[in-house]
Amino acid sequence: MITRFTSNSSGTGSPQPLRRRLLFGVASSAALAACGGGSDAAAPSPAPSPAPTPPPPPPPSSVWAAVDAAVDKAAPSFGNGLTVEVAIPAGVVYSRSSGGYTSQTRNPIASATKWVTGSTILRLVQQGTLTLATRTGDLLVDRNGAPWSGPIGQITLSDLLSFTSGLEGDVDEATATSITLAEAVLRIHDSQSKPGVLAPPKARYWYGATHLRVAGRMAEVATGKSWQQIFDAALRVPLGWDSASIYSLGGPNPALDGGDGGIRCSGEEYMRFLVMLLRKGLYGGARLISENLIATQRADAFTANTVIVKSPYQKFTPDPMYHYGLCNFRECGNPGNAGACDVDPTLRFSSPGALGFGPWIDVYGNYAACVMTRQPQQGNTEPSEVLKQTLAPLIRSALTSNPAVIRPLP
């Protein structure tokens, strides 16, 4: 039985009240437990320190500052304005315009057309309609209806796309816009089948329109369609180009090489084409050209004995002596050595136009870029070439900061 004690008024030796003694015991036990005295329980671990916050990416203005400065400095050399765009496989990461020219401006692109024409024909090779070994004599006939024969009938599609077919680069009679492509190619045959005119395949490189007119006519015969219909199905529609993007104002003798201005298109459309090539033939989830064909397109088409008769780079001092693939130049430090060029870290593929429109793909930089413009004077390509050389290392440097995509491409 618990007896309850109460204190008396004298404060003499009365026992401590039970409640006070119980509270004291509980408090003492709690204090000992808190101090760990006599306990096997481990003390709680301190909370881990938060991971350091990574620094934010630099703002776009600082990422592209050097590129902006180079474009702005060059702008006065472009009488009709210019736009420069850069794309990685995911899409466009840089765009800068001046002088009223934008990436939506639709203009003729001159010899930048050659790359598109060659890729259109490679699309037919991809589909099995043609092969790179298909010969002129397999598809073309002369004015008497007989297949092309003799050396001129042995020219392959690959020879034509590399401008090493042995044909002269230009035949004036074939350039009239009022005739058909079929008639133009008959005139080429009339001219080039004469004794002593044709060179052996791979003996010479002659930059010009003749090769692509013949290749385009082979495509028309193989498909039974006009060139514009071939281009529409092969690339224009898959790349989402506008129906206004046509060859030579839609005439019956399209300038497949870029003469008469070549294709009229916007820079934004051309960037889609470049990104397709950068992705090695993929666009919009579809395989337009195989990786093997893209590799063939980029490979050096010259032999050790190929002589450069005519090239747009001959007007530069020094002449870089760039070699050619299938409708694109191979820009590198040692173009005469195909193996060294292939592994050159500065290797670029390009197809510059006489109006200054200058597209290129930097293989090891993994980007595509284009100087978009229409110079007032045809042949004024130097400002675009100089700007390309200036921008190439600056773009690579900017891309190390992983800039954001500003215009995604499918």
Residue ranges of predicted features:
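N-terminal secretory signal peptides
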Residues: 1-18, 24-34
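Bacterial lipoprotein signal-peptidase II cleavage site
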Residues: 36-44
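A short, well-structured edge-of-sheet supersecondary motif
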Residues: 71-103, 240, 358-362, 367-372
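Catalytic-site signature segments of enzymes, centered on catalytic residues
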Residues: 106, 171-271
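Active-site helix/loop module of the DD-peptidase/beta-lactamase fold
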Residues: 108-112, 124-168, 217, 221-260, ...
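Active-site-proximal alpha-helical segments within enzyme catalytic domains
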Residues: 160-163, 211-218, 259-283, 294, ...
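Active-site Gly/Thr loop motif
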Residues: 243-261, 265-268, 299-370
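Short, gly/Ser/Thr-rich active-site loops of penicillin-recognizing serine hydrolases
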Residues: 378-410
